[in-house]
Regions:
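N-terminal Rossmann NAD(P)H-binding glycine-rich loop of SDR-like oxidoreductase domains
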Residues: 4-24
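N-terminal Rossmann-fold cofactor-binding loop
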Residues: 31-36, 53
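NAD(P)H-binding glycine-rich loop region in Rossmannoid oxidoreductase-like domains
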Residues: 40, 46, 50-91, 99, ...
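Active-site segment of SDR-like NAD(P)-dependent oxidoreductases
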Residues: 75-76, 114-118, 165-168, 186
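Conserved Rossmann-fold NAD(P)-dependent oxidoreductase catalytic core, especially the SDR/UDP-sugar
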Residues: 91-139
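Catalytic helix-loop patch of NAD(P)-dependent Rossmann-fold dehydrogenases
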Residues: 122-167, 188-191
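Glycine/proline-rich active-site loop of Rossmann-fold NAD(P)-dependent oxidoreductases
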Residues: 157, 168-178
């Protein structure tokens, strides 16, 4: 049975990844800060590990005995000081990479963001190779782009970077609540006949 560590397991995306992998025969170690949420995830194939991305020793310990890591943990907001994003998103990712290298990890899946492509102009048919060298529209975007660049320094860690867009669903505290709040004020217009 494959053993996988999921960072950010107590967050919106992380909880879904924990559930999906545990239902498909993986032994899951759910890494997160929120003990109450983390313990609610526990079952015969899920063990909660309370830890912090900004603490290298937590990640080193959490990676021990694991085959794979899904690094979904991040400070995910568009507001806040650079130092907060740097500590959590950039150094946290570096610590994950270091721990994966030390543990001889078989695979690291890093959850980044398509917002790294965000620009003040329209863009169509964007390719992976179109990733900018820098993007300072906000500190979240900047931290994700800087974090992606770290992977070049770890060619010995088999990894893949995902950039999912617009995640929503049950438990969402970001996108759907905003849409619903707006709809209460102005309604949701139907385009055409709504199809």
């Amino acid at each position: 049975m494959k053993k996988v560590l999921i960072t950010g397991a107590t967050g919106f995306l992380g909880k879904y990844v924990v559930e999906e992998l545990s239902q498909h025969g993986y032994q899951v170690r759910a890494f997160g800060r929120n003990r109450k949420v983390g313990q609610s995830l526990e079952n015969s194939s899920v063990a909660f590990f309370q830890g912090d991305l900004t603490k290298q020793e937590d990640l080193t310990q959490a990676c021990q005995g694991m085959d794979m890591v899904v690094h979904a943990g991040a400070l995910s907001t568009v507001w806040g000081p650079w130092e907060d994003f740097y500590q959590t998103n950039v150094l946290g990712t570096k610590y994950v990479l270091e721990a994966c290298r030390e543990a001889g990890m078989q695979r690291l899946v890093y959850v980044s963001s398509p917002s790294i492509y965000a620009a003040p102009r329209n863009q169509l048919a964007i390719k992976e190779s179109d990733a900018p060298q820098e993007n300072n529209l906000n500190n979240y975007i900047r931290s994700k782009l800087v974090s992606e660049k770290l992977f070049k320094d770890y060619p010995d860690v088999p990894s893949i970077i995902l950039r999912p867009r617009g995640l929503f669903g049950i438990g969402d505290t970001s996108i759907l609540p905003r849409v619903l709040k707006l709809s209460q004020k102005i309604g949701i217009p139907l385009i055409g006949d709504g199809r």
